[in-house]
Swiss-Prot record:
SMART domains: BTB, ZnF_C2H2. SUPFAM superfamilies: beta-beta-alpha zinc fingers, POZ domain. It comes from Mus musculus (Mouse). PANTHER family: AGAP004733-PA, ZINC FINGER AND BTB DOMAIN-CONTAINING PROTEIN 22. This is Zinc finger and BTB domain-containing protein 22. Its main location: nucleus. It comes from the Eukaryota. Belongs to the krueppel C2H2-type zinc-finger protein family. It holds the Pfam family zf-C2H2.
Amino acid sequence: MEPSALSPSGATLPLPLSLAPPPLPLPAAAVVHVSFPEVTSALLESLNQQRLQGQLCDVSIRVQGREFRAHRAVLAASSPYFHDQVLLKGMTSISLPSVMDPGAFETVLASAYTGRLSMAAADIVNFLTVGSVLQMWHIVDKCTELLREGRSAATTTTVTTAAAPSVSVPCASVPSGNGGTVAPATVGSVRSHTSSRASENQSPSSSNYFSPRESTDFSSTSQDAFVASAAGSGNRRDGGPVFPAPVVGSAGTTSGKLLLEADELCDDGGDGRGAVAPGAGLRRSNCMPASAVPQKHWVYVKQARNCPAPASLVHQDPDLEDEEEEEDLVLTCEDDEDEEMGGGSGVPAGGEPEATLSISDVRTLTEPADKGEEQVNFCESSNDFGPYEGGGAGAGLDDPGGPTPSSYALTHPPRPLLPLDVPGNQILVFPSSSSQAPGQPPGNTAEHGAVTLGGTSAVGLGIPSGSGGAPGGTGNSDGNKIFLCHCGKAFSHKSMRDRHVNMHLNLRPFDCPVCNKKFKMKHHLTEHMKTHTGLKPYECSVCAKKFMWRDSFMRHRGHCERRHRMGVGGVGSGPGPGPGPGTPSGPALQPKRESSTVGGGSGDEANSATPPSHRRVWSPPSVHKVEMDFSGGGGAAH
């Protein structure tokens, strides 16, 4: 008999091996996925510990005399600038420009390992500079957003989001820099940030291929939340608006600092704004760059203290304008959101001048009317704005018969500005309203747009006729300029912004491997390499002469072809010293030619003595003359 599987006491006995069910075989094509989500953070944490202990570090970075050790693989993965330095050039020691703050760089270097960045509100500009040099655009975008939010929060008391519900973050009051307290703030729910940079396909050598991780859900925990609170005082008599004192949503941790993820936690639009308490906040640094000033409105920067007041802006001769060095007026751009209409100018109420000339003193041409100041007209050329002015060339802001600026600023379209970009191309603008009655003075707010001005030929402005259009049409391309530099200029492509940043910092990242000459642009290095290879790819079809540079070849080809045509077309049919056939005649322009000592001359010689009309040179009879023979012979002197 088979032994019972149960013991007399009822306990289960182990089955014999032969009776155990066999394991189910896995299909041959099956793939088993195993995820270890904690490995990524643990790996970076381990690398950061190695960096802090100086272990396995293979690259050193010097900033203003201080040296930092790091891992080249981490640097190349986190910064396009370091990618070019350590991967393409194989450098083991990198010296960064002295414009960077060593403390800010140390924090940014740690954020490459930890994914977190902690900064004081007054040091945001330093971090913006470091991010611009290292081309870490997620830091540049975040610092720009914080500066923009701080500026807008200083001009409003409470801004609530209209598209999403708000989430209240309770926190204790934090003392501000001027003795006030910051009330608990409200943070709007933030959409995950989707950037168009992630879809760009660029070569690693262009320093523009890098794009940070884009979408990350906003965490409401105390470690991932931050609230920007601002002061309500609008007085800027001692250096500009106050910057908000940040509040971190955890009691007793990182008071007075901003704790933010290196990934994009918030979208650039800033859906939510914090409720503010009057008198709170830290003052914004006077050296803040123009990145804090968003785009698309002309603004007026006032003069420094003790500077002579500028004369009224009237139309002057261009030569005289160059000599007016004491006016020191600067035009920049400002975002069309957070703007209020009214009158404004560069003279404070009460006549007290500003202490410093900084970006914190920027005032738009359309400031609130309570400033009690006059508007300033920056564009005095009536020729530029004729299509929009029905009052003729003399119509302007100073027209005594027209309405005051405060009366028409809210009801009339803006006055267009016609600035020039860096290459000298004209940037067209259009008014915010599609029509304007003749004789009415325009407003002062200008919006950029690649459209054809009304009444102006598109051909005369150097743009295709099909590129123009009404506001909002296909011709408006300024909306695509989403890549901002910290100077305030916007670009439609990230590669253009990278080249612009290199120009700012005078960086020359491309050096010749033969002679070590450095260049700002990669195509400059490519052209320079021709001097070492001796390659001359351009050959003249007339004289078979070869050229290395295309512009030299094009200049030579034009002259060579003209000489060839003159030599072939100027052959005469008979001997004689007279001019050959086809030679222009005229007593005023006909050069004199003395008769040859030889009995006769060919038609070639006769024609060669008289160049074409656009090359003819007049010689008085008493001057020794030289005949030029373009058919291949030498010149004969008489």
